[in-house]
From Swiss-Prot:
InterPro entries per record: LysoPLipid__transptr_LplT (IPR023727), MFS (IPR011701), MFS_trans_sf (IPR036259)
GO molecular function: lysophospholipid:sodium symporter activity
Protein topology in the membrane: Multi-pass membrane protein
Keyword Acetylation listed: no
Periplasmic side: 1-17, 74-90, 166, 248-256, 302-304, 365-366
Pfam families to which the protein is assigned, alphabetical: MFS_1
Gene: lplT
Family: Belongs to the major facilitator superfamily. LplT (TC 2.A.1.42) family.
Transmembrane segments: 18-38, 53-73, 91-111, 145-165, 167-187, 227-247, 257-277, 281-301, 305-325, 344-364, 367-387
Location of the protein in the cell: Cell inner membrane
PANTHER family (alphabetical): MACROLIDE-EFFLUX PROTEIN (PTHR43266), MAJOR FACILITATOR SUPERFAMILY (MFS) PROFILE DOMAIN-CONTAINING PROTEIN (PTHR43266:SF2)
Record's protein name: Lysophospholipid transporter LplT
Ranges facing Cytoplasmic side: 39-52, 112-144, 188-226, 278-280, 326-343, 388-397
Main location: membrane
Organism of origin: Escherichia coli O9:H4 (strain HS)
Taxon lineage: Bacteria, Pseudomonadati, Pseudomonadota, Gammaproteobacteria, Enterobacterales
Amino acid sequence: MSESVHTNTSLWSKGMKAVIVAQFLSAFGDNALLFATLALLKAQFYPEWSQPILQMVFVGAYILFAPFVGQVADSFAKGRVMMFANGLKLLGAASICFGINPFLGYTLVGVGAAAYSPAKYGILGELTTGSKLVKANGLMEASTIAAILLGSVAGGVLADWHVLVALAACALAYGGAVVANIYIPKLAAARPGQSWNLINMTRSFLNACTSLWRNGETRFSLVGTSLFWGAGVTLRFLLVLWVPVALGITDNATPTYLNAMVAIGIVVGAGAAAKLVTLETVSRCMPAGILIGVVVLIFSLQHELLPAYALLMLIGVLGGFFVVPLNALLQERGKKSVGAGNAIAVQNLGENSAMLLMLGIYSLAVMVGIPVVPIGIGFGTLFALAITALWIWQRRH
């Protein structure tokens, strides 16, 4: 089936519904699998510092394949690329279920995720246009965060019951995403007929990086989203160690409940951003970014569950308001310069490089014995300072 690009720009067209459902199921699997695999590592007595290593092999796949996945997304119908990528995720989750080394299985899921991301965001610009793109991003983020909310909780709760059941549920979610991808209209490839010479692809990707970096707006977006997602992933792992130390709770479910509060907040923040921020007023999101770091610092000092829930929800609201406009800005400007697929691939490189760096520093801090509360305080302080510096730089340029 095919249809011309931009024929139906409704936020609830058939194609958009299929994208949102597929994204929900795929993201549900991603987040449930993380906590199910963390429970598996705990059950098999892996050291605590190995937990962030699990995410590092995942983002390492993003970085390794960054020069190629953008071109893949732009050279084929994006819905079919998403289906293939979810198939890889399904294979990775199934391999962990059948006893293959969890780091190897999770790496395969990372490869699928790397291929999936440019297609899932790039297709938004093909299904809707102009002012509706921010709203479409809001829908995508809301779907993603709802999946984070339910997937994280499901992964932790099912893992407390039986780790294998949790892992099987992840594989089932990926299978559902593959089916949903079938219903995405087969849109024309954005940039067909490109060279598949790996050297040329790498050179083309580096040219896309250079082009986006030289543009002040896209550079601003790249740095902002990279800082946010690097910090967000690190916070998830910090919670796993913070909960038993600060709250005295040792189950698998409580960290997932706390992560779910962040997810709920991001849904609210994403909705607010869609209503209050346009591509011309993106700088309105910057104070929210600074406050994220401040609230993380305050959160790290808590010892009661209810204040922890409230502060994490606030972090989520601020995060959703901060990141959605930056995503939309990059997609709109990137689509016109290097193609949406390449723009998102460059964004993934930045975000996952930031994740790798922050997780590496966090893992090292845990390995050398720094207590988790001082880690959280330092983490929040540095994030607030980094976003402040970015805002000052953006206003000057």
